């Protein structure tokens, strides 16, 4: 069977296009690697190659140049590109020992740059923050953009990364460009739908926050969770 090409993937699901639309934080590890490498080989598609590299990162933290070369589809050029990325991350990345952000109150979400970056956005953005068992932030990702409704915000999309992160809980955040902090009927419907899905999956929806004018409104505090 011929290798699957990036052009065979739905444009909305292509890694580089997803970065343009949603930002790099919305991508899984394998998708980020695919965006870096660009394309696969005749015998091994880029998604397979990037998944194998992502698996190595989980097992070996930072694989060596020689280890990368053992992956079918990675030659000296791709290995060098990845090693350069690893080194940049090592030089400029957040120190591993830095304390993670812990969310125990709604306002604590304002410590996350992806949330405060919602200021001035003309469209609604729906974000999900995954948390470990100690309520520490694992990752914050943009799930969708546009008018919030239950058809756009599907539990499958919301919880997919939480499952990958092995998260214990999530917090959903979306902005109201109008500046009105009050939840709409659609906000409440989406919140309850996601809460029920979380109960089935064993991943709690701790809160759904509305971001406006540098502040957040908690749907849990309002009694909708």
Curated annotation (Swiss-Prot):
Superkingdom of this protein's organism: Archaea
Pfam families assigned to the protein according to its UniProt record, in alphabetical order: RadC, UPF0758_N
Key words of the record: Hydrolase, Metal-binding, Metalloprotease, Protease, Zinc
Keyword Hydrolase: yes
PANTHER family associated with the record: DNA REPAIR PROTEIN RADC (PTHR30471), UPF0758 PROTEIN YEES-RELATED (PTHR30471:SF3)
Motif segment (JAMM motif): 174-187
Domain spans labelled MPN: 102-225
Gene source species: Methanospirillum hungatei JF-1 (strain ATCC 27890 / DSM 864 / NBRC 100397 / JF-1)
Family: Belongs to the UPF0758 family.
Gene3D superfamilies associated with the record: Cytidine Deaminase, domain 2
UniProt name for this protein: UPF0758 protein Mhun_2739
Coiled coil region boundaries: none
Residues noted as binding Zn(2+) in the record, renumbered to the chain: 174, 176, 187
MF terms (GO), sorted A to Z: metal ion binding; metallopeptidase activity
GO biological process, one term: proteolysis
